[in-house]
């Protein structure tokens, strides 16, 4: 039996902010990332848990 990945709880967006800019984040469901447009970074969501470490973030294209 295969397990489906844990879903991200969108209510977390009310409490989470970008660790760089302290601005709100946008949820990209397709990529499973939280996006900070100000910092131009996308933070991964793994097993339903956002990884809010700058070293783990993906730089966004301009």
Swiss-Prot record:
UniProt record similarity statement: Belongs to the UPF0434 family.
Annotated signal sequence is none
- Which InterPro entries does UniProt cross-reference here? Trm112-like (IPR005651)
What protein does this entry describe?
Answer: UPF0434 protein SPO3421
Q: Which GO terms describe its cellular component?
A: cytosol
């Amino acid at each position: 039996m295969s397990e489906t990945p844990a879903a991200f709880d969108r209510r977390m967006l009310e409490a989470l902010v970008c660790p760089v800019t302290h601005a709100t984040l946008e949820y990209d469901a397709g990529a499973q990332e939280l996006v900070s447009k100000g910092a131009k970074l996308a933070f991964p969501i793994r097993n339903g848990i956002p990884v809010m470490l700058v070293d783990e973030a993906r730089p966004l294209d301009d």
